[in-house]
Amino acid sequence: MRKLDTRTIVVASHNKGKIAEIADLIGPFGFSAKSAAELNFSEPEETGTTFEENAAIKALASAKASGLPALSDDSGLVIDALDGAPGVYTANWAETADGTRDFAMAMQKVEDALAERGASKPEDRTARFVSVLCLAWPDGHVEYFRGEVEGTVVWPPRGTSGFGYDPIFKPDGYDTTFGEMSADEKHGWKHGDAFALSHRARAFKKFVETCLEA
């Protein structure tokens, strides 16, 4: 595993919600970070079929364009009753005809697909959020960090916090959805803690332990 010997990195994302969450997580570590969106980097086409492949595409593009290490996230909602969908195509389910993303529409698509499968009981609506962070260097070296959190898809959507599919995902052991939690509650982790809640915080915890700590 390669250690990160700089605190200047690029957050390889154009997703405002994702950029904000990563900024919250890296903030305490003294990073100087700009996003690919702020640097006006074009969005690379995500042609991978796994979270790891798509995360690497984004991180490597930003690392090579900037000459700096770049941290990306590829994440998605994996629903058992839908054979793992939307999975790596989670963002695609939200795409509209004009190229924007409508997650209210995407959540309705999820519910409609579950209804078609007759998945109305909680035990038939099990799912997990997956996050794969990729740290890439300009020389092409990459490190991956995967985090997952198990839960249930609920309906109707609950809460207005977070972003994406957060309002319909209730993590196991909790009565509230990610959409009803503050950012601190959703991540459930700060440096030194043994436990993290969200998929992204779990992946980030591995990143810290692997690349930042001595």
Curated annotation (Swiss-Prot):
<keyword id="KW-0546">Nucleotide metabolism</keyword>
<keyword id="KW-0378">Hydrolase</keyword>
<dbReference type="GO" id="GO:0036222">
    <property type="term" value="F:XTP diphosphatase activity"/>
</dbReference>
<dbReference type="GO" id="GO:0046872">
    <property type="term" value="F:metal ion binding"/>
</dbReference>
<dbReference type="Pfam" id="PF01725">
    <property type="entry name" value="Ham1p_like"/>
</dbReference>
<dbReference type="InterPro" id="IPR020922">
    <property type="entry name" value="dITP/XTP_pyrophosphatase"/>
</dbReference>
<keyword id="KW-0479">Metal-binding</keyword>
<feature type="binding site">
    <location>
        <position position="75"/>
    </location>
    <ligand>
        <name>substrate</name>
    </ligand>
</feature>
<dbReference type="GO" id="GO:0005829">
    <property type="term" value="C:cytosol"/>
</dbReference>
<dbReference type="GO" id="GO:0017111">
    <property type="term" value="F:ribonucleoside triphosphate phosphatase activity"/>
</dbReference>
<feature type="binding site">
    <location>
        <position position="45"/>
    </location>
    <ligand>
        <name>Mg(2+)</name>
    </ligand>
</feature>
<feature type="binding site">
    <location>
        <begin position="163"/>
        <end position="166"/>
    </location>
    <ligand>
        <name>substrate</name>
    </ligand>
</feature>
<comment type="subunit">
    <text>Homodimer.</text>
</comment>
<protein>
    <recommendedName>
        <fullName>dITP/XTP pyrophosphatase</fullName>
        <ecNumber>3.6.1.66</ecNumber>
    </recommendedName>
</protein>
<dbReference type="GO" id="GO:0036220">
    <property type="term" value="F:ITP diphosphatase activity"/>
</dbReference>
<keyword id="KW-0460">Magnesium</keyword>
<dbReference type="InterPro" id="IPR029001">
    <property type="entry name" value="ITPase-like_fam"/>
</dbReference>
<dbReference type="GO" id="GO:0009117">
    <property type="term" value="P:nucleotide metabolic process"/>
</dbReference>
<comment type="similarity">
    <text>Belongs to the HAM1 NTPase family.</text>
</comment>
<dbReference type="InterPro" id="IPR002637">
    <property type="entry name" value="RdgB/HAM1"/>
</dbReference>
<feature type="binding site">
    <location>
        <begin position="13"/>
        <end position="18"/>
    </location>
    <ligand>
        <name>substrate</name>
    </ligand>
</feature>
<dbReference type="GO" id="GO:0000166">
    <property type="term" value="F:nucleotide binding"/>
</dbReference>
<keyword id="KW-0547">Nucleotide-binding</keyword>
<feature type="active site" description="Proton acceptor">
    <location>
        <position position="74"/>
    </location>
</feature>
<comment type="function">
    <text>Pyrophosphatase that catalyzes the hydrolysis of nucleoside triphosphates to their monophosphate derivatives, with a high preference for the non-canonical purine nucleotides XTP (xanthosine triphosphate), dITP (deoxyinosine triphosphate) and ITP. Seems to function as a house-cleaning enzyme that removes non-canonical purine nucleotides from the nucleotide pool, thus preventing their incorporation into DNA/RNA and avoiding chromosomal lesions.</text>
</comment>
<feature type="binding site">
    <location>
        <begin position="199"/>
        <end position="200"/>
    </location>
    <ligand>
        <name>substrate</name>
    </ligand>
</feature>
<feature type="binding site">
    <location>
        <position position="186"/>
    </location>
    <ligand>
        <name>substrate</name>
    </ligand>
</feature>
<dbReference type="GO" id="GO:0009146">
    <property type="term" value="P:purine nucleoside triphosphate catabolic process"/>
</dbReference>
<dbReference type="GO" id="GO:0035870">
    <property type="term" value="F:dITP diphosphatase activity"/>
</dbReference>
<feature type="binding site">
    <location>
        <position position="74"/>
    </location>
    <ligand>
        <name>Mg(2+)</name>
    </ligand>
</feature>
